[in-house]
């Protein structure tokens, strides 16, 4: 899978039997640091593409991690489908497909980092797949409550026939009928369903909340942590952050540093974040961000030409 001649991000395509494809980006560990035991898989939050996590991938690779990112099907980004057909189950199946692809390519140790809505998906599958550890950031635990906060109305209380055609979620049109139907059919919507999914969790787990997050209640994340019988989990707060971890450079850098420390700690079987990291140069983070935006634009243009 690795291409040592690549200058920066390596682009992969997972082709599915139904003709759809999932785009995957690979970032190799920097050559001047010892390579870590685990490959990091990043699941982006809702309405976030994998190139939005270029900085985090740079931090992790600078500290010796092999990093994988992907765009879900029927989501923003480079994979197949339209966001108005996105459901939580499609997000789940996209994640499982990438995990299977990594396994098929000989990657045996995976640490999963999931943000926001993707964290709810991670909680759903964490006991069903082989992971070394899990890290979540501003992870959704009560989907219905988060949707009500984000949309400023509890649309899940309405009969399916009375839903508007689309829900405007962070500037994107989410198909209401298909999304809500899936939420109820597969029990995505409640805090209790999340607690049931993580019951018996045994792998190391670190959760980050944001102290100014109006979409996720810290008390419910604490309830999630408390419901896990294992002592191998810990909760940290990103001070000064809202649910939008990229709202400014100070918040963003704190997010990168904290998650990188968590990954390094968990790679060594620890939960304590009192750990030193190698800080990539600001110019390097900026450079890779610009390069990945160009790569994204090039791929989008190629896809348009093929359409």
UniProtKB/Swiss-Prot annotation:
The keyword Mitochondrion is assigned to this record: no
Entry annotation: catalytic residues = 116 (charge relay system), 213 (charge relay system), 243 (charge relay system)
Q: Which UniProt keywords apply?
A: Acyltransferase, Luminescence, Transferase
| Highest taxon above the source species | Bacteria
* Matches recorded under InterPro entries: AB_hydrolase_fold (IPR029058), LuxD (IPR003157)
Q: Which GO terms describe its molecular function?
A: acyltransferase activity, transferring groups other than amino-acyl groups
Pathway per its UniProt entry is: Lipid metabolism; fatty acid reduction for biolumincescence
Q: Which EC class does it fall in?
A: transferase
EC annotation from Swiss-Prot or TrEMBL: 2.3.1.-
GO annotation terms (biological process): bioluminescence; fatty acid metabolic process
* Purpose of the protein: Acyl transferase is part of the fatty acid reductase system required for aldehyde biosynthesis; it produces fatty acids for the luminescent reaction.
UniProt-listed HAMAP family = LuxD (MF_00774)
Which NCBIfam families does the record associate with it? PRK13604.1
For this chain, the family text in UniProt reads:
Belongs to the LuxD family.
The name this protein carries in UniProt is Acyl transferase
The organism is: Aliivibrio fischeri (strain MJ11)
């Amino acid at each position: 899978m690795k291409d040592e001649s690549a200058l920066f991000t390596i682009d992969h395509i997972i082709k599915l039997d139904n003709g759809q494809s999932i785009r995957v980006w690979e970032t190799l560990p920097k050559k001047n640091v010892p390579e870590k035991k685990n490959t990091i898989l990043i699941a982006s939050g809702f309405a976030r593409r994998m190139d939005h996590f270029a900085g985090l991938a740079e931090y992790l690779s600078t500290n010796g991690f092999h990093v994988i990112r992907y765009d879900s099907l029927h989501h923003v980004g480079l994979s197949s489908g339209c966001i108005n057909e996105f459901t939580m189950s499609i997000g789940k199946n996209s994640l499982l497909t990438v995990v299977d692809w990594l396994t098929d390519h000989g990657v045996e140790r995976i640490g999963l980092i999931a943000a926001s809505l993707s964290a709810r998906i991670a909680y759903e599958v964490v006991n069903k797949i082989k992971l070394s550890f899990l890290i979540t950031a501003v992870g959704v635990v009560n989907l219905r409550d988060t949707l009500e906060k984000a949309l400023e109305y509890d649309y899940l209380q309405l009969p399916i026939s009375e839903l508007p055609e689309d829900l405007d979620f962070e500037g994107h049109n989410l198909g209401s009928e298909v999304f809500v139907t899936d939420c109820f059919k597969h029990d995505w919507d409640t805090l209790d369903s999340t607690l049931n999914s993580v019951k018996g969790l045994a792998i190391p787990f670190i959760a980050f909340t944001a102290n100014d997050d109006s979409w996720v209640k810290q008390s419910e994340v604490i309830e999630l942590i408390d419901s896990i019988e294992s002592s191998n989990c810990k909760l940290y707060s990103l001070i000064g952050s809202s649910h939008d971890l990229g709202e400014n450079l100070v918040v963003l850098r704190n997010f990168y540093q904290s998650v990188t420390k968590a990954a390094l700690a968990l790679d060594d079987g620890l939960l304590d974040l009192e750990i030193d990291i190698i800080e990539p140069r600001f110019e390097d983070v900026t450079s890779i961000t610009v390069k990945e935006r160009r790569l994204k634009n090039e791929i989008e243009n190629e896809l348009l030409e093929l359409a």
